[in-house]
Amino acid sequence: MKRSHINYAVDKAHAIAETFRVCLPDFAYFTADAWRQQDHTLWREVLDLQLGWDITDFGRGDFAQTGLTLLTLRNGQLGSASYPKPYAEKMLQIQQDQQTPWHFHRHKMEDIVNRGGGDLCMQLAWATPDDGYDARRIVGVSVDGQRRSVDAGETLVLKPGQGVCLPPRLYHRFWAEKAFVLGWEISMVNDDLHDNHFLEPGGRFPAIEEDEPVKWLLCSEYARLQR
């Protein structure tokens, strides 16, 4: 991804949050320069757990078609006495017709919620023991406490206010229809480095082309602050 696209995506995310009257924590507004002025000893939880902005094109090179804007608000670390939270929380911003590709989580259970905007469309399929796609097995999920069953690959539509619980090893892909969607993720501890499996090769964190100065550091770039 180009740095200019990342900078613009975070600027746009701030504007969208304001439109939906969603208030964000202070660190969501720290520019790269502002981060350098902070006492990092006071922000160890944010830096160590990579809370903050996460803009990705999943290695596909076309953010408008395949991409996602995330803000990790809370997280923990398994087995850590310093960060014992067993849960995580993220804001998701999904542009109209922008998709997140097929993937599952090996350990994490999560709820994905449509907080407002258009329709959040999702397709589901169980993973096979060798991490393939099980096209035959029926998928049963809970949508706001109501049991729903869908065929593998069938589209489940979440209207604003609806959410679905996704257990581990359940492949899912999703996109927004009719309008932009403000999404939310409530989950077990999140580990994007080790817990994600994508059906097709790609990348969770994008390679970045530095075509303009860094305005917003991504959560995966906090090591720059040590330089």
Question: Across the structure, where does each feature detected by a protein language model lie?
Answer:
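A short beta-loop-beta micro-motif enriched in histidine and acidic residues
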Residues: 79-88, 99-111, 115-116
